[in-house]
Regions:
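Phosphate-handling architecture centered on phosphoinositide signaling
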Residues: 2-169
């Protein structure tokens, strides 16, 4: 939603996601942004664009650029209750997995969007709830296969003294 009034310029957009009669066993993430931020051939972060090479991994494609776009992020728990929502920045994340049809996304808290950090318990196995960014992963090189390698390795690393990325399916 946006305010429109004669002789008034509004810098404030408000988004809201509604989910009706959803039957799901995992959390739901909703991302709302102007379509061109993701799908414009000139500036969309999710598409090949006009400069992509014709062969994998499609260097020159828009998704190889370090572009950040504004997005409204909403996170719904398994019981359909809204857990958290905020304005953020979004970038394509990863190495060659960016070339997959489903791409990983980094969601960034930044003061210019309204939050300097994300304060929410996304993960049960960590002792902190404050994050500068979260990653919505496409399972990397396991994409279109088992889609569980990243999660399985994270589980194996939980009791080690090494840093690891936790997950929430």
């Amino acid at each position: 939603a946006k305010i429109f009034k004669e002789d008034y310029i509004s810098n404030y957009d408000q988004s809201k996601t509604f989910i009706f009669n959803a039957d799901h066993s995992i959390a739901i993430v909703s991302l709302v942004s102007e379509p061109d931020n993701f799908f414009s051939q000139e500036s969309g972060i999710y598409v090949y664009g006009n400069n992509a090479s014709s062969s994998w991994p499609y260097f020159g494609a828009n998704f190889w650029n370090d572009w950040e776009r504004p997005v409204h992020f909403s996170y719904y728990e398994k019981d359909n209750k809204l857990g958290i929502e905020f304005n953020a920045g979004v970038k394509i994340f990863g190495g060659t997995s960016r070339s997959n049809d489903q791409r990983s996304l980094s969601i960034f808290a930044r003061n210019k969007y309204g939050l300097g950090e994300i304060d929410y318990p996304f993960f049960d196995n960590v002792s902190y709830n404050k994050f500068q960014a979260i990653i919505l992963r496409n399972t990397g090189n396991d994409w279109i296969r088992a889609n569980m390698r990243d999660a399985a390795i994270s589980k194996l690393m939980q009791n080690s003294d090494l840093e690891y990325q936790d997950f929430n399916p």
